[in-house]
Each structure stands twice: as C-alpha cells, then as structure tokens.
C-alpha cells in the first residue's frame, strides 16, 4: 500500500499537467480578450496552474467558488509568475496581487469574493488594468 501511495505521489506532477482538461470561456477586460480556463470544482481549484512551465500571453484561469469568502492563494508547485485579480459578482476588480513562483505567501482579496482570475504576471499592468475596472463575461 505504501508503494502505491509513493508511486502516485511521484507521478503527481506529470499527471497534474496532463490530466486537467477544463472548460474554457472568453473573458474581456476593456478591449482585451482572455481565453480562460474555468476551475469551478474543488480538485480543479486546488491544482490551478500548478506544474505548468508556461502560459500563452492572452490565456488565464478563472477560479469560481460556491461561497463568498477571503479565498487566499499561494504558489506552491507553480513555476510561472502570476498576477491575480479578485472579482466581485459584477466583474469589478477588488484588488490585484502579484505572485512569485514557488512561494507560499498568501495572497488574499480585500473583501469576500467568489471569483479570482490568474494571468501571467504583468498582464494587468501592461494593459493599465486596475480596480475597479470590470471583467466581462463571468459565468453565473
């Protein structure tokens, strides 16, 4: 039994990168389109962008939670620098945090939210996106 558990643990990075097939939607911030993977299930939210080596510039991941809370994020097993926008239900940005790879510092919203949007670090800054701008196209 221990051997099986250790084998599965050893395979986790490879499995995590290939097994996650998430639905995608288009989100819009100003005139900018983001092809966005949607992580709405607990396992998908827990994995997020872990194990990935890169992400195309106009891609993102949207995290959808069932309840309003101070949903905090960290960068364990995440190899690309990211920025995260915490969003109200109307799509308005509460705050944006910048996160460094492999760091376990918590990054939290300034108020309880149900949505968080991760992009490559610098994506928001390079497009002059800041609170309280709105992200359009959020699913209900």
What does each of the following model-derived ranges do?
Residues 1-12:
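Bacterial N-terminal signal peptides
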Residues 17-140:
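Compact, glycine-rich, soluble single-domain proteins
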């Amino acid at each position: 039994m221990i051997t099986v558990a250790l084998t599965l643990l050893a395979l986790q990075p490879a499995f995590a990168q290939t097994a996650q097939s998430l639905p995608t939607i288009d989100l819009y911030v100003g005139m900018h389109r983001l092809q966005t993977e949607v992580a709405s299930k607990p396992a998908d939210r827990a994995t997020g962008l872990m194990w990935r080596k890169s992400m195309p510039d106009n891609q993102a991941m949207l995290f959808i939670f069932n309840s309003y809370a101070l949903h905090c994020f960290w960068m364990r097993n995440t190899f690309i620098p990211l920025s995260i926008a915490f969003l109200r239900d109307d799509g308005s940005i509460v705050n944006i945090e910048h996160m460094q790879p492999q760091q376990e510092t918590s990054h939290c919203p300034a108020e309880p939210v149900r949505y968080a949007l991760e992009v490559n670090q610098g994506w928001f800054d390079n497009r002059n996106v800041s609170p309280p701008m709105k992200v359009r196209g959020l699913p209900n």
